[in-house]
Amino acid sequence: MMKKISFAAIFFALAMFVAAPLAQATTVSEVQSMITQLRGKVQIIQISGKNAETKDRPGLLGQIDGISLTLDQGKFCNSVTKVRDFQKKVNDMISAGKLNQDPTLGPTGQELLADADAIAAALNELAVQSTGSQCF
């Protein structure tokens, strides 16, 4: 009887140890919050050029909405692809001199890229939790 109790206690302790990291794992709502924060930065970042408010900002916001939508659908790898597309657009705009790069004037293009990297990492974590493998 004592061996069964000891085995059960050890098994329970081991199960709690293995399950503990899952309690601290990234959640969809946490990633949505990160996306909302990125969206807020895109709404206020200084964008120069004649298409800033008619094409550039709406395009970036549309990409962010796409990330959010695929996340809600549980398509984590599709969301990562959309984050990478967003980053490409931001890099193109930085290269063209369209995005603010002075942190004293508000969000910068580099800040958008860093936030997008954090979102992609969190999405990969969700993919691992869901499927056991990362997105590529």
Regions found by a protein language model. Give the residues of each.
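Bacterial N-terminal signal peptides that target proteins for export
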Residues: 1-11
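Intrinsically disordered, low-complexity Ser/Thr/Pro-rich tracts
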Residues: 7, 23-25
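Residues in flexible loops and secondary-structure boundaries
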Residues: 9-10, 15, 120
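C-terminal segment of classical bacterial N-terminal signal peptides
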Residues: 15-23
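Soluble extracellular-acting proteins and domains
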Residues: 25-136
